[in-house]
Amino acid sequence: VLFDRGLVAPGVDAGYVDSENAFGGKAFPGTVGQYNPGSQPFLKVNRHGERFMNESQEYDNASHASFQQPGHVYAMIHDANFREDVDRFHTIGCSALTRYIPGMMEGQLEQYEGEGLIMKADTIEELADKMGFTGADKDNFVATVARYNELYDKQNDEDFGKPASRLSAIRTAPFYGCWLGASLL
C-alpha cells in the first residue's frame, strides 16, 4: 500500500520509480521516513502553491494525486491549533495514532524541525520562504492559504468538497509546513 506520509526534504523529488537496486525493482526516492501526521487532512499544496485535491481521502488516493504534481510531492500546512484540529478530524485507522498517542505529533514536530524537514514560521509569508516558494509560486501559496481560510469560515469547501469537519483555519502562529510524498509501508 502506498501511504501519504513519506516526509521529504525541501527541494527533493519523490515518488514511485523503477530501481534495479530496490526490492521488487521499485523504490521511493526522496522520502526520509514516515510522518504519521501527514495523513491528517490539513491543507496540502503542490510546488506551485496550489491546492490540488480534497485532503480528506484514503491514503493511497492522496498518494496517487501527488503523482500528477511537480516532483511527486506536496506541502502540508497547519497552524498552532493542530492538536484541536486533529481531535476534531477524528481520523481512523493508523492515522488515528496522531490523536491517540499523547505528545506524538508534538514530539515529531520538534524532532523533524530540528532536522530541517519541518518548517516553523511566525507568518505565512515567512513559511513560504522557508519552504522554498518564490515569485508567482509564493504568491499562489499565500493566496491559497487565504482562500482555504475563507472556505473554513464558510464551513463549505466549494473547491474540492472536503467535509466541513475536516476543514481547519490557518491563522494562529506559529505556522508549520513540510513536504510529503508517497511511501511504501
Regions found by a protein language model. Give the residues of each.
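An anion/pyrophosphate-binding glycine-rich loop and adjacent beta-alpha core
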Residues: 4, 8-136
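A glycine-rich dinucleotide-binding beta-alpha-beta segment and adjacent secondary-structure elements
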Residues: 139-185
